């Protein structure tokens, strides 16, 4: 499972410059990391900022394992089935996703890796928060006719509205390993150990992952799924990871049908790149 990691995603237009662009940006600390929102029109910033802050605040209250009154803490002593049955409607999909990924990965990803009496959803909480924020902004945007917006939480991104170009930073720190576009509703997440060694743990052993993987980047139709997949695919590595993705293809509980639209980029310590990218999303 995953601890807080350094940020590796930077919007490409912030690096390349924004000549003639009216992009507005706002950032603030939340959920143990940094959140930021970007809007292409100045007048849209209050709407995207309000929707995002409300969603992130809600998730912080619901899934804080250090808060004895949070839903996560209240449910942690129940069985996995009872957790799903008793979870609030707003977060049930969060638990279902965690337990499904745990089952398909053979326990490599496990929200109970700290012990049977502890639920830890840190590996997907950021993605869940991003999905809520994007849905909230899109709903408000329809009534207010608001424009394009991109939401970032700790380096995980979701296009709340419109299309955005971004890139995953090279481990050598000299530019981008790849660039790609995010279309409306799509998200990208990365799990990495570039600077401080691995802070991602294999729940099967309880040890930090040491499998030659430097980072995994996942583009998916949900930020929560991108978050979960980037973590489990880092743990599993390319060979086991591809086997996991084949299982996901056949899994009826996967909410988006076949997983053909999931794009994955592994960057290895050897310098090699391994991809699962049927639609050619990553550009090198």
Which residues make up each language-model segment?
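Mature catalytic core of soluble alpha/beta enzymes
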Residues: 2-284
């Amino acid at each position: 499972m995953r601890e807080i990691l350094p940020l590796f995603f930077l919007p490409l237009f912030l690096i390349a410059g924004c000549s003639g662009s009216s992009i507005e940006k706002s950032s603030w600390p939340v959920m143990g990391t940094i959140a930021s929102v970007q809007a292409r029109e100045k007048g849209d910033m209050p709407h995207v900022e309000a929707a995002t802050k409300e969603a992130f605040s809600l998730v912080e209250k619901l899934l804080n394992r250090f808060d004895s009154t949070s839903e996560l803490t209240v449910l942690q002593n129940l069985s996995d089935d009872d957790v799903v049955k008793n979870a609030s409607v707003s977060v049930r999909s969060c638990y279902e996703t965690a337990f499904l990924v745990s089952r398909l990965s053979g326990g490599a990803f496990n929200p109970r890796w700290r012990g049977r009496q502890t639920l830890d959803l840190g590996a997907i909480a950021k993605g869940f928060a991003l999905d809520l924020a994007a849905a909230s902004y899109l709903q408000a945007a329809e009534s207010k006719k608001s424009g394009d917006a991109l939401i970032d939480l700790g380096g995980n991104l979701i296009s709340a509205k419109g299309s955005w170009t971004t890139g995953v930073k090279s481990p050598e720190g000299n530019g981008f390993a790849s660039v790609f576009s995010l279309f409306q509703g799509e998200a990208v997440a990365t799990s990495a150990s570039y600077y401080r060694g691995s802070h991602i743990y294999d729940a099967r052993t309880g040890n930090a992952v040491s499998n030659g993987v430097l980072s995994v980047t996942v583009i998916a139709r949900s930020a929560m799924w991108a978050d979960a997949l980037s973590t489990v695919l880092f743990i599993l590595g390319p060979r086991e990871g591809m086997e996991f993705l084949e299982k996901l293809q056949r899994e009826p509980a996967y909410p988006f049908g076949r997983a053909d639209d999931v794009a994955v980029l592994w960057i290895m310590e050897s310098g090699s790149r391994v991809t699962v990218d049927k639609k050619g999303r990553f550009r090198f």
